[in-house]
């Protein structure tokens, strides 16, 4: 077992199978030394977490949803290479399903950000956006990631 997978095990995280896309795109794509991960949704035990921050979900539930999205991002990266090849989590972009009055999207994205820093340490620190939107099918969040890898 490699270093990052060992860390995931220590955290009690098992990477899920990457879902097949439902449209004309792929879960992750490598170009040069970058891997772009398509928006991942929060899935736990095969169940999609749904709801809107400020209506159906509280902040802690939304943070957990973005963490699940980040776990999905790592699973997508692993379809291309070992997670030990990651040299930097460059960027994360979070779409948080929330009411128009809610302003806690950045706080909700901390679930994803804190998770990747916990897994990767300093190389997990990244640039980030967090916006409130109406996510299709009332899914709680969607997180997109860019990672740099070594050969």
Residue ranges and their predicted role:
Residues 1-151:
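Short, polar/acidic, helix-capping and beta-turn segments at strand->helix junctions
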């Amino acid at each position: 077992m490699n270093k990052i997978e060992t860390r995931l095990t220590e955290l009690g995280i098992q990477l899920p199978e990457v879902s097949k896309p439902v449209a004309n795109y792929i879960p992750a794509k490598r170009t040069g030394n970058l891997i772009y991960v398509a928006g991942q949704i929060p899935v736990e035990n095969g169940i999609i977490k749904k709801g809107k921050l400020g209506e159906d979900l509280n902040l802690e539930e939304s943070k957990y949803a973005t963490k699940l999205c980040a776990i999905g991002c790592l699973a997508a990266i692993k379809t291309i290479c070992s997670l030990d090849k990651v040299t930097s989590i460059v960027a994360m972009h979070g779409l948080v399903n929330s009411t128009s009055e809610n302003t806690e999207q950045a706080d909700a994205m901390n679930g994803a950000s804190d998770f990747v820093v916990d897994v990767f340490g300093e190389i997990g620190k990244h640039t980030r956006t967090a916006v409130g939107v109406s996510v299709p099918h009332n899914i709680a969040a969607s997180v997109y990631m860019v990672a740099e890898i070594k050969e």
